[in-house]
Amino acid sequence: MLHTLHRSPWLTDFAALLRLLSEGDELLLLQDGVTAAVDGNRYLESLRNAPIKVYALNEDLIARGLTGQISNDIILIDYTDFVRLTVKHPSQMAW
């Protein structure tokens, strides 16, 4: 399943998101959700321990001036890759 986090993790039920993640799921951080990828924050540590791949939309990182602050554990993608993820995962959950 593809999970998309478009809101700030501080404004989301992040604990519920973590509970619903399963091995093999993928999480895409976009819009304000990219703040979860900033190195050193508590949400990133939880994502590192989850059995998933985590992506961030590079355009949203650039728009927020965060490109130099993102953890190396996060896979940066563009809109074409975003489309590929949505095609790969017929089931999606938006947060």
Curated annotation (Swiss-Prot):
SUPFAM superfamilies: DsrEFH-like (SSF75169). The keyword Cell membrane does not apply. It holds the Pfam family DsrH. It is found in: Cytoplasm. GO terms for biological process: tRNA wobble position uridine thiolation. Keywords: Cytoplasm, tRNA processing. One of its GO terms (cellular component) is sulfurtransferase complex. The keyword Lipid biosynthesis does not apply. Heterohexamer, formed by a dimer of trimers. The hexameric TusBCD complex contains 2 copies each of TusB, TusC and TusD. The TusBCD complex interacts with TusE. Part of a sulfur-relay system required for 2-thiolation of 5-methylaminomethyl-2-thiouridine (mnm(5)s(2)U) at tRNA wobble positions. Belongs to the DsrH/TusB family. This is Protein TusB. The lineage of its organism: Bacteria, Pseudomonadati, Pseudomonadota, Gammaproteobacteria, Enterobacterales.
